[in-house]
């Protein structure tokens, strides 16, 4: 696995080749979309640095990089709700990663199955309004993540 800053492979090699050459951003991160392998539901969007991607590939469990905590984290390390990776894909220019996983428990730190539990609607005046959908909690986050 190489960083695009270290080398500049030809576009055709990136788009059509078989070498994994993730294109990390200036902060050393790549966006990762994680979906449920069975249902296809989007569970979360997070970021990976080179180490998180490598650990995910090697271990078969999802690892991410937290921008707010500035550290690597294994999904489920606190909650026990790990993600077993069934498939990893990269997009055409290798600047985004897609994980298809078997999710144990909830994916969201709020206790919900998915981090995408609010839909943008409009109120009577046309202003944006968030509507809760699929918002049932599978666990109480206060019991798992004490403050």
From Swiss-Prot:
Task: Please list the disulfide bridges.
Answer: none
Give the record's pathway. Answer: Amino-acid biosynthesis; L-histidine biosynthesis; L-histidine from 5-phospho-alpha-D-ribose 1-diphosphate: step 3/9
Catalysed reactions, semicolon-separated: 1-(5-phospho-beta-D-ribosyl)-5'-AMP + H2O = 1-(5-phospho-beta-D-ribosyl)-5-[(5-phospho-beta-D-ribosylamino)methylideneamino]imidazole-4-carboxamide
Quick one: which residues bind Zn(2+)?
Answer: 92, 108, 115
One example GO MF annotation: magnesium ion binding
Binding note for cofactor: Binds 1 Mg(2+) ion per subunit.
* Leader sequence segment: none
Q: What's a GO cellular component annotated to this UniProt protein?
A: cytoplasm
E.C. no? 3.5.4.19
The record's annotation in InterPro entries points to:
PRA-CH (IPR026660), PRib_AMP_CycHydrolase_dom (IPR002496), PRib_AMP_CycHydrolase_sf (IPR038019)
Q: Which UniProt keywords apply?
A: Amino-acid biosynthesis, Cytoplasm, Histidine biosynthesis, Hydrolase, Magnesium, Metal-binding, Zinc
Name the family the entry cites.
Answer: Belongs to the PRA-CH family.
**What the protein does?**
Catalyzes the hydrolysis of the adenine ring of phosphoribosyl-AMP.
How does this protein assemble?
Answer: Homodimer.
This chain's protein is named Phosphoribosyl-AMP cyclohydrolase
* Source organism per UniProt: Rhodopseudomonas palustris (strain BisB5)
